[in-house]
Amino acid sequence: MNTYAEIAELYPSDAQDLLDLIAGESDDYLRYTPNFRSSPQTLADGLRNRQADRWWGFLKEGELVGFFMLRGLDEGYKQPAFGVFVAESASKAGLATRALAHALAWCESEGIGSVMLKVDPANHRARQIYLREGFKEIRVCPATRQQIMEKQLTTRWRRRRPAPL
């Protein structure tokens, strides 16, 4: 089975594909992604209205099989929040790890010093990926009970981000 998927930037016109991808998954598969399951429209609206936030998709044979994003930049946060979703049909092929590497490289190239994420404490596989990649558990989110993790990025190659106009 070919597991290759290309990474492509997502645009507002891709919002319906994102909704269709989430809608095609079972509640059981979505159990670790409460925001994707309970409010996919909010995600699609975030993509439609993005400015500084970054959204990428995994395309396999032209079909969206996953997406990942760095959010919070539109709201002025200096530390973006990483999120990733891979369809069950494309899971266990290393796409989440590729997504994380791509997002972290983008942050470093933009002079961003750290990234945060939230992960369900029962999602042992994802937690192990994040710990292996240097994320530290910093606290539990009181609203979602998810573990908040953070990673400081390498500063020696950072360039300064231009000030907003």
Question: What residues fall within each predicted segment?
Answer:
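Conserved GNAT acetyl-CoA-binding A-motif
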Residues: Q79, C107-K118
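Glycine-/small-residue-rich active-site loops that bind phosphorylated ligands and cofactors
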Residues: A87, S91-K92, A122
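C-terminal "cap" of GNAT-fold acetyltransferases
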Residues: G113, D120-R127, R132-E133, R139-L165
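Acetyl-CoA-dependent GNAT
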Residues: E9-A15, D20-S89, L100-A101, W106, ...
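Conserved acetyl-CoA-binding loop-helix of GNAT-fold acetyltransferases
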Residues: K92-A105, S109, Q128-R132
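Conserved N-terminal entry element of GNAT/NAT acetyltransferase domains
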Residues: M1-S13, T155-L165
